[in-house]
Structure formats: C-alpha cells, structure tokens
C-alpha cells in the first residue's frame, strides 16, 4: 500500500518536472529613460482543443497581471468538417461551421494597456494558439516594465497544465539589444535609414500585438493600401487599430504604422510582406506533413448573412497562429480558426484578415555600444584567490584556464562586475576579459599571506610591520637577505657566540676523529716496517705450530713457549696444540691485542693535532671584541647582498635579439649595424651615445623608437551571416482539382517547392480521401528561426606597418614603413626586411561577437552559388537583397498503401553556422586590440605577438661630431604623482611633468629611478612647453624615493610608492607589458649597492621611526641576554 503511494508520488513529481518550461527575458543592466519594457515568449507542447479553450494564465510574479486580461473575450470560431456525402472528390466535399467561443487571457490587448502596465508596475501575460482540428500549441507571451529586471531574478507563470519559469537574464549591454553577441541600439530617425553608410544595420526580432481602436488616426487598412499601391475602396469602413511592438525584447513601445518612426515603417513592411511571421514549430517538428482540403469561405461573425473571409482547410501539425481579426469590419471581429489558414494576403481587397500577433525579423539602422576594457584584481582567499572583473560598460566574454569563472554578476549603474574563484596561486592567473589578456602575478598574493601573519603578530601597532615585513615577504633571495639582515642586527650579539660555539664543537669533533685516525695509521706503518726488517734478517715471524703471523718479536717468543705446551700465548688458556684448534681459539680470545698495545705505549705520538684541539678549546668566542667585529662585518656583507638582490624587474618579452653594442659606442667601424627580429606586439626603444673615436668627449645621442606593428586591411563588408533551421513540409491535396495553394511558408525569405501532381491509383492516397486517382503533393523547403550570428569581412589587401622615429642629435624624423620598406635619413637606415603573417588577400575574417574579441580566419568562404551548410550560406548583405542558399539535394516522394505521401530530401539539413561551431577548433583564430573599423577598412594591433618582423638598422660612420655634439634641447623634470606599489610584480606608475625648451620637438626617454637603480622607462616625444609622462616601473624597496630622470639628471624631489600586498592585486594587460627598452646603461655595482642600502635605512628612519625604536629595543634585549648567558670573566688579582 505505502509502496504504491510512494511510487505514485514519484511519478507525479516526474510529470510535474516534465511540464516546467523556461522563458528567458534578456535585460540590459542599466536603466534608461522612457517607457522601456522587456518581453519574452515560450512555445509549449500541444494539448487538446477542448483544454485550450479553458486556459487561464496565472502568475506568481510580484507584479500583478493587467486586469483587462482577466476579462472574457468573444471570438468567432471557424472549424471545418467533411460532408456526409463523399461520392466524388471535389471542393464541396467539406464544409465549415461557425460558432462563438470565449477565451480568457488570449493576447487581445486593449488600447493603452502596455503603457498603463508600465506606469502601474504591472505585467502583461497572455497566450496565443496554433491549432489544427484536434489540438493546439500555446505560446505564452510576457511584457513587463524594465523595473522587473531589478526586482526579480525569476518567477513562475501557470498555464494549466504547464508551468513556465521566467528567468531574468542581465546582459552585458548597457541599454542596447543583444544581437550577434553585440549590443545594438536602434535609431528611430528616418534620416539614419537614408544615410545607411553612416550607421550600422542589424536584424532584430520583433513581437507585435494588434490593438483594436476606432479613430481617424487608426485606419490601418488605408495605410496598408497606400503602402502596397492597391486600389481598394471603402477602406474607411474597415478594421481600425494599430500594432504595438517590442523590438528585440527590450524597447519602448513602437506603434505601427507611424510615418515618422523608421522602426515602425520596417515593422509594418514586415507584417504586410510576411503576415504569418515565424512559425510555431517545436523542436523535431521541422519535418511535418499537411493534408490540404482546399479553400473555403466563412461568415465572421456567424450571425451575418454573407461569407466574408477566405480560409484554407488543413490537417496536420499546426505551425502558425490560429487567431486573427477580420479586415472588412471596423467593429473588431476576432477570429479563432483551428485547422484553417486565414487569408492574410493584403494584396486583395476583400475576404481577408490581419494577424493578431506577429513575430519576425526586421532590419534596423542604429549603432553598436562601445566595448570598454576590463579591470581585473584578486585578493588572497583561503588556499586560493578571490578575483573580480569589472568594466565600465559591460563584459561580453570572460574566461580563464585556471579559474572557476562563474556568472555572479553585480551591476552598479552602467558598470558590470563578475566575481570568481581561483583555487591555485602557485602560478600566475591568466584571465581573458573583453578580448584582452590580463595576468595577475600570484607571487604577490603569496607574499600577502605571510604579511598578514606578521601583521597579526604586531596587533598592538598595525603600522609597525609595514616597512620590514614586506621586505621579508619578497620572494627569492631578497626576502631571505632581508631576514638575515634583521636577525643579525637584532639578535646577532646572542646568535654569533652561539653559532661560534656550535661551529667549535663540530670542529673539535672532527679534529678528534682526525687525530685518532692519524695515530692509528702511523702505528700500522711502524709495525709493517718492523716485520719487513725481521723477515730480511732472521726470517719469518709466523709460529711454526699454530701458523699465526705475529706482529712483534715478543709476541713470537711467547708463541714459541706456549704453543709447545698447549697453552694460549695471550690468555694462557689450555688448548689442543694443533693448528685448527688454536686458530679457532684466537677468534674468540679477548687478549690477542696485548702485545700490540704494549708496543703502542712505547711509540711517542705527534703533537700537531693535539695543539689544534687545544687551540679550539682556548678560542674566546665569548669575547665582546670578537662579537662586535663579526656583527659589523656581517651587517656590511648582508647589506650589500640585500641591495644587490633588489634589482629591477625587466620589461622584456620573449624575442630574438642579435644586436651588438653598449651604452656608449665608439664609431670605429664603417657602419654600426643592428639586426634582430621581435614580435608584432612589442614596442622597441634603442638609445645610445655615439662617441668620436678621436675625441671621447664628443658624442651624439641616438634614439630610435619602433612602435608595435599595426595591421590595416582593406575589406569588403559581406553583411550578416545567419543561422537558420531547415524545414521540410509535405503538403498533400486530394479534394477537387490539383490547385497550387499559397501556403504560409511562401512568405519566408528563403523557400523552395517541388510539386507532384495526380496519382493514378490508391498507392498514395490516404483512406480519408474521397475518390481514386485524385491527389497532388507539394514538397516545400523553407528556412525559419533566422538569427544573425556573425559579421564577415573579405580581405582585399592587407598591410603591416610600424611607425619609426629617430632622434639623431637635433634631427627628429618619423615615418610609417611597411614590410620590405626602409626609412632612410642622413645618418640612419631602418628597414623591415620581412614579416611572418597568417593573413592573405582573399581571406574572410569572421567576427562572432564584438570585434574587440577577435575573430576566425576562413580560407574558403562562399560568396556565390552557396549551398545550404557552407560557410556563408545564409547572408544578409548591406543595402542588398537577402541572399538565400541553394538546396542541391534531391526530392523523393515516399508512398505507402492508404497513407499520406511523405516528401524526403537527401540533401544537407544542418546550417553552415552549426557546422562551423562543431569544428571551430580547426580554424585559425586571431585576437585584436586598439581596433578601428569601417565597412571598407579595419585597423588593429596584434596583442598576442603571433606575427614577427625582421628589423635591420644601419648607422653611418660619417657623423659630423663638431656640429652635432651640442644639443640645445633643455629638459626640466618634476615628479607629480605616483600610483601602485614598490617591490611587487605589479609595479608602480610615476607621473612626471617634463618641460622642454630651446627646441620644438625632442624624442627621448624618461626613467623612474631611486638613488641607485632605475626601474622603468618611457620613450616619449616631447613638445615645447609642459608635457605629462607616465612611467611604469617594477621593483624598489620601502625606502625608495622615485624620481623622474633624464640621463643623469633627476627631479629634485621624489615620491614614495605604497607598500605592496596591502591592497588588491590588479591584472596586467599584455599590451602594457610588451615593450623592449635598451639604452645600454651599466648594471648596479658595489657603489650602487651601498647607496641602495643607505637609502633603505634612511627610508625606515624617516618613514617609520617606531620601527627603528623596536629594532634597537630588540638589540638591547639581545645584549642583556648575552650578559646573562655569557657573563664577562673576572680576572683575579695576582
């Protein structure tokens, strides 16, 4: 019993889950002005016609549904049926039946309903029906004010027996509509449509609802007649009203027709040309069969005397809406026609209707929202890192190969923020955001954990550990050197004697071992010499009885006396006088070394090792003089090592450099040449002083700057590439003559039809067809669910260029050179010898989203005679008609006895876009940065360095040192501001105010330096007057005072950067890190090291004197501890 109840409960839950469907509403994340609403819809599975007539939508959303939708609406229901007399097959073999039916919640919107729902914060939830004679497929629509996006994340709509979960998805768009992965903002002005070259064009899905409203301004049939150029009469007495539309699921209401709004004009044109709009096919219904009964007329409403509406009766899967409104009456006669296609063709004047709901694509002019760069930062969180990315506009794409990037979005005004977790920090974190590669140096995060521990230790004074603990947390040798320096200063007076004592104990241990080993080896050598002399003079030293080899003469005599008597010569124990017995006894005898020890006592040992051991014992490791000497010496050595280890972090990417030369180059050779290659993303700066080989005091400054590679492509904008679903419909007719009917899919943008006429037997006729040999079949192919997915550009020509500037003394020249081109001046020649590239003429660049995110290179893109499934199969060119693909497959009509014929198509049924997505990894991709584009040209830079340039620089020897040695340009420096941190991998940015006098333009470099080392440089072209220069550097220490330097001259004052590891760690853009600076400056030597150490000590004293007091207190404590543990020895008076 209970098991059956449990089973029933589980089955009921499974059925409930099966009947839950999603409706996703896309919301831009920034509020805009106007009555903006968002909308969505969802297709539901079929239910019986009787159940469909009883549907009532219910909502659990916190916005109440509009009251007017709960009222009962009356429609004229038109159904068809076979006549009782089926003797002959003709157009009169079936008939229609009209009646009145009531619905509650059907999409029959009232005038000002959407506007009122916006002001009153109410929702509009309704449904539409696509029906045949037996069942209906509901489509639920929802329109809500944009405020709902901020108030709710999801809610439920009930439409018995279905439940629809409404999910509000915040897009990265600020106010625009998400299409092709980009944010499009339509422009309603007609002038923008007339000047299409100045605006972008996008295909946007639009949903329109007919509003019946009487009035002279709502004569919609008159507008249709005027738009189509037909000559219909009595339009004033026909239906009146308008369509209210929501564009792209996110817009203020658009009213059609409206002559002053281009959006309304496009919507109205779409309704007239394709009145059925998109079909309502569910997945797997793209291949279906219709049985067409034929054309028939009906009376709307059923009480009128004459028939006033034409319809086409069918049986099969319903694909289009069954609701419409009669065009011939101004009273608003609504129609519900299950199993019938109403005549929506507006080219005829009578017996037609207007669609009640229309859904389709329209082409609109407008602009795309700008894509802003991302900022990424991370903080330490447990064993990993907690990161956050934010952008001023929105984030269209964010991925990371080492992080779990979730979609935890937060929005603040127009800014979008995404939080995610990185589980590992043992390697640098790489994040791709908005087409940019960001690198977070995790060694800074690892330092933070140690720093936090130290900061907790000094909880009573939080500022104390800043200047010292951060130096300890620097990875590598510098951190260990800092620790050794601090330990020596604070506890050296205790640790030095303790370490010395430990060393002495170890030395004495080894000295004792060496002494013992040496004495043993010396004694063995004496015994060997004694034995050799005895054997030379008297013979063998072996006992004749026991055959034992003796070491001394005394031992041999004892053997001769005892072995004869059967006694042991060592312990005098009785044993049998045989060789075997005595040898066995000697192995266990404890006194065999007796004669050896007696001889060892007579040998005098050497005193060398004894003197060494005694010296170690007498060493005065407790002496204050010794401790002071070692303490001072260690502090000096450790300070030098500490300063040497705090070198700058070079900003050098991976590149091949064959250049030869140093900071100062004497011009002995005929020419001075550099030859190297480096990535396209790198910027190169080369600076040297060229000296006169005759007079070293005469020199000329040479400064060469080569910008990163720019790629410019002349392109042809091919338009928009569409994804689509291919439908195969079989339409069979067996009532009356074989007529070529106008089916709803004939208004699709891309369709093709193959007709088969009369059959000669029952082989293909279903049993419900009256007569024999009657029937014709139409096989229709058409594309629906068109969706723009990408933007392709065909490359006409491509150019790779770099801007090269040369400052030679006073001479300043610049030129942009292409590959295999040279820049020649009087003294220098700079050439790009070759470029390794992956772009070529004729390639197609495909952008699947914002162009800032990069694209895909297609070597084979279809431009003419395209087949469905090829790349570029369904295209919407700009300012040209829609291009449909060809369908090269063959049709086959499959016949079985007494069944409806079925069309078969053996061609490809998968769109080109879906094929590309399935094999996208096989295509070559590229990234972009600093992209600028029009319909005719695209310019960008390669952020990945995938391309390489071979550069050759030749400097002539013919230099007039007499005239060029004097440079009149005067540069003044002042440090204005600093951001960032010292000593970290992220670095700092120093803002310098640089003044230039005596010359109009000067190309030079400004460095960020402290007293000892320069940590970064920026090549800049100065103009006369004040210039602002921002320099990025990495390195330094807590005492570094960063100044702006030009050559050997620096600003009078410097600025100190923040301590690292205290704030969040920001990501570094690859573009900011891809630069090579080479000025041949000498490396930091011993003098430089001492300056650096002194600067650090002075920085500690000036910046945080409490630290110095604490260090001195620790030093005093170690001295007291020394006096307790190692008191001074008192000398007794003689």
From Swiss-Prot:
It comes from the Viruses. One of its GO terms (cellular component) is host cell surface. Residues 609-632 form the ITAM domain. A motif (YxxL) lies at residues 613-616. Glycans are attached at residues 132, 233, 345, 397, 927. Residues 756-776 are annotated as: Fusion loop. One of its GO terms (biological process) is symbiont-mediated suppression of host TRAF-mediated signal transduction. Disulfide bonds join 27-149, 61-155, 107-126, 131-136, 173-183, 208-245, 232-349, 374-433, 378-387, 403-422, 734-769, 738-776, 750-884, 764-895, 779-903, 805-814, 822-831, 862-866, 969-999, 992-1044, 1009-1014, 1045-1050, 1084-1088. InterPro entries: Envelope_glycoprot_Hantavirus (IPR016402), Gc_C_bunya (IPR048791), Gn-B_hanta (IPR048790), Hanta_Gc_N (IPR002532), Hanta_Gn-H (IPR002534), ITAM_motif_hantavir-typ (IPR012316). The record marks 646-647 as: Cleavage. The chain crosses the membrane at residues 485-504, 627-647, 1106-1125. A zinc finger (CCHC-type) spans 543-563, 568-589. Residues 505-626, 1126-1134 are cytoplasmic. This is Envelopment polyprotein. The lineage of its organism: Viruses, Riboviria, Orthornavirae, Negarnaviricota, Polyploviricotina.
